[in-house]
C-alpha cells in the first residue's frame, strides 16, 4: 500500500489520483481509500472539500489514443453515511479493512490518502480499538460541566491512559469533549490485548507545502467555497432535519457557518474566524505528522511545488528504486520533516 498524507490545501488528493493513473496506464489497477474524517458524509461536499473531480485524470494524446482521455480513479470511504451520524475511528478502521481487502482481492494497488492524521495513523500503527458504547449516566453527569472542567477531566484521563489518541479538536465543543471523555474512560477500564488490527506494509509519502503558499491556498480556497455555495449547502442540511448542534460537532466550516446561519455570528466574523481556524488546523496537521515520525513512522516528504509529473516519478522511484546511476542533484523525496 502507498499512503499519501499532507495538510489541507497541499494537493494530496490530486497527487494520489495522478499516482494511481500512472499505475493504471501500465496495466496495474490502483484505487484510492480516503482517510478524511468528514468526507464520509453524504451532502457535506463543499465544506469538506470533497472535490470529486480530483479523482479524474486527463491523459494526453498518444499513438494509442489520438485524443486526450480521462481516467476516473475508483475511490472508497466517501459518501458512506448521513449528516448527523457520529462516524468514529473504530468504524473507520473496519471500513478501511473492508475496502483494503476488496481492492487487494482484485489485484489492485490501494492508495490511502488523507489529512486526518489520527485515522491514517490508526491503520499504519495498527491501533487496537474496540467500539465504545454510549454511557448515558456519564453523559448526564458531564452535561452540567463547563468546557474548562471537561478539558481538565479529559486531560487527566489521557494521562492515566498514556494516550495521544485524540487531538485538540476533542475540546472544540462540549459534545466532542464528552464523547472523548467517554472513550478514554472506557479504555481505562478495558484491556486492549485482544483488540487486533492486521499489520499492513506501506510507504508513506508526505506532501510538504511551504507555509506561505499553504496559507495563500487556504485563503483562496475558502473564498471559492463561499462563492460555490457553502452557506447554502449548510442551510440545506439544517433544513433536512440535522440539528445545529450536530453540524457544529463536525467543526471548522460546519461549526462557523452554522453559527452564522443560526444567528450566533455575523457574516464578517464568521469568515474571519473560520479562516483563522483553518490555518490553525493545518498547523496542527503538520504537528501530528511530525509526531508520527517521532512515533516511528518513516515519512518521505515531497515538495508540493514540484511539477506533477516529477512528483509522481519521484514516488515511483521511492517505491521501486531504479538502478544506481550518476545523476546531478538529490532526490525530490527526503525523509526529513515537513514545513510547520
List the predicted regions and their residue ranges.
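Phosphate/pyrophosphate-binding catalytic cores of soluble transferases and nucleic-acid-acting enzymes
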Residues: 1-320, 335
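Glycine-biased, low-complexity coil/linker segments
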Residues: 36, 324-329, 337-339
